[in-house]
């Protein structure tokens, strides 16, 4: 393995990076799918948990934390309810993982070729590469993200019986723009998130690797630390994105039937602040961090292992 900042950007051929990134995303997604459904349900819940009077006229369930929400979904919708939206989410993670790692590798290699007066410090180089990879990956795969949210927000009332039905319905009633509701919040969120994630990951990986943790868990630990730091900073934009993704003609048919009508990132943020205060912007943060830590750990651990296997296979083929 390369040391320091050379680690992610120069190991493996392009097809190996694409394959490793895609497999890492797929494995990670399946492992954390139930927590993702819980997070989305909590983010779309607009009533205050501390004010029982706000529950009086609501239409839909009242979720009060990660464990109770998991139990409620399992009780009301069965085990499959915890994996709602998993098909578009798997497609999202596969394509996003492949695009993200490929773009990161390409950008960092390009930056590394700059002459000495223009070379960026290692943390800045990782930040720029991570932000670019995140922005491009988010925009190109955003329709899958929107579909994942809408399926996860469904209760027993099947708004979209299948993925193909959902695509046809959104295109027919909302047009092509319907697939990109909230995309500005997503890009605004993911650019600093991925920049912070990769910069932190590259910074802490070397010190952690010197601890010689078992089973290659140094990469996983670095991924956890990087994810928690980055996720907390940009979480309000993630909540705004989810609220915007369920706008449109089906807004009142999701599990939370009282979702307000939102228009634009700033106005949505103002409405959330007005109705729930600063805490309203961080609804679902706890489960998001619980999800983000294992998701990032599994992603980075799987990526490193798969890439290593592919390189070994390639070496054996050459010999």
Swiss-Prot record:
Keyword Transmembrane appears in the UniProt entry: yes
A single GO BP: transmembrane transport
Topology class, membrane: Multi-pass membrane protein
Pfam family membership, one: Mito_carr
TM spans (from-to): 17-35, 91-107, 127-147, 182-201, 221-237, 284-301
Gene Ontology CC entries for this record: mitochondrial inner membrane
Compartments, as annotated in UniProt: Mitochondrion inner membrane
Record's signal peptide: none
Repeat region (Solcar), residues: 12-110, 121-207, 214-309
Keywords from the UniProt entry: Membrane, Mitochondrion, Mitochondrion inner membrane, Repeat, Transmembrane, Transmembrane helix, Transport
PANTHER family: SOLUTE CARRIER FAMILY 25
Family: Belongs to the mitochondrial carrier (TC 2.A.29) family.
Functional summary from the UniProt entry: Mitochondrial transporter that mediates uptake of thiamine pyrophosphate (ThPP) into mitochondria.
Protein name according to UniProt: Mitochondrial thiamine pyrophosphate carrier 1
Gene: TPC1
